[in-house]
Amino acid sequence: MLRPTILAALAALTFTVAATASPGAQVARAELGAYTTAHTGVVTDSTVTADAHVVATSDGRTILRVTAEGLAPGGSYAVHVHFGACTDYLGHFQYQHPGAATRDNEVWLDLDANAAGRASDQVQVAPFNLDQSLSLVIHQHSNPDTGPGAGPPGPRIACGNLELNA
């Protein structure tokens, strides 16, 4: 029987190969890890690592896929695209900036860790320009409900800079 990490790696490889097979597709990749510099709202002793791909296909689809490990077993986490590099500590990428912190205006993905602290998921989102300084952040808590009184997803526990056609 294949171990979950091997299955996740195969799934990510299958996803990447299938998505990049179409001519004109753009692929951005990020390897996420712990922050190394203390900053407000950042956890520096995280053991979370992840691999992420954003694929913009020639037919107009944009898909984000994240595979992570080192999460708390059974935990739920928010993943967001952020403006700038990890060391810039900027806010969430928004289609209409400044705007509402909603699934429709930002790139959100939910990760739910299994008993071994691993998670993998993907989401199709509205197209956005991959040829700009962006990073991918895993937050300590799941995505909040939207609307009045919605809370933030907590501190940042892992980050990786998106690199186009990496």
Predicted segment positions?
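N-terminal leader/targeting pre-sequences
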Residues: 2-166
